[in-house]
């Protein structure tokens, strides 16, 4: 139920960001509203690049530290890449180390899920390294299905558990 509410919230936030970004207001020569056309409380990529470099957009993306995956997949979603771009910018040259924790849903064997969690963490690692982050700053851990955030036995719960968490 929470994931459905989050999905509705994210869709509403995206619609609001697009509407604000496309509306014209007199008196603001920049073409941006008071908040740069971005809902700072929005989830994944609410602005989708309409106001690149906006501080509020970067702050919203920086707050995203959990990246979700489709069933039996380790492919990064575009919204995850946008958030990871901001994290990469922060990590480059900082020397700060982070842990990438790979997780899966409960389906499948323990061994399979440990490997899938590792593939997911490695996908995030590869992306960050391609953005210029030193591999020495990134530690990988796979928990497989051992640390679920949702304990239900349905698609909504499984979707919440298919993730990589970036821990500073």
From Swiss-Prot:
Disulfide bonds: none annotated. A lipid is attached at residue 22 (S-diacylglycerol cysteine). A lipid is attached at residue 22 (N-palmitoyl cysteine). Part of the Tol-Pal system, which plays a role in outer membrane invagination during cell division and is important for maintaining outer membrane integrity. The Tol-Pal system is composed of five core proteins: the inner membrane proteins TolA, TolQ and TolR, the periplasmic protein TolB and the outer membrane protein Pal. They form a network linking the inner and outer membranes and the peptidoglycan layer. It is found in: Cell outer membrane. Its main location: membrane. It comes from Pseudomonas aeruginosa (strain ATCC 15692 / DSM 22644 / CIP 104116 / JCM 14847 / LMG 12228 / 1C / PRS 101 / PAO1). Residues 1-21 form the signal peptide. Residues 147-168 are annotated as: Disordered. Gene3D superfamilies: OmpA-like domain. One of its GO terms (cellular component) is cell outer membrane. Belongs to the Pal lipoprotein family. This is Peptidoglycan-associated lipoprotein. One of its GO terms (biological process) is cell division.
